[in-house]
Amino acid sequence: PSFAPDGSRIVFNSDRGGAPQLYVMNSDGSNQQRVSFGQGRYTTPVWSPRGDLIAYTRIAGDFRVGTMRPDGSGERLLTDSWQAEAPSWAPNGRVIQFFRTAKGSGKTSIWQVDLTGANERKLPTPVDGSDPAWGPVFP
């Protein structure tokens, strides 16, 4: 689960309807609403720093990172390759990092993509990397 930046809502995934899908509810647990309706399973939801988008992993034969608005509209897949998962927002809300598992080898690496789905690139790390997370930004 992930809290909206203002703390008023929570996004989470649940398999209550069969395959895991995304739901948004008020922080007190009321007003639970399903917001994902695509094919496959939806996991690892996380609110953007501005609260205007939710990033997630969609699993439908492959793993892809996407975004949607909190009401479920505007769904957009940002990656189109083998096993991209576990999105993490940059503090400015313009870039998403994720990890990818290489087909065949099982090696993992950190990647990032901007919100247009362009400018996808592998980030250099000395060893395999997974589950990226951003630290606080200090002036």
Question: Where would I find each of the regions flagged by the language model?
Answer:
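Sequence signature of WD/YWTD-type beta-propeller architectures
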Residues: 1-139
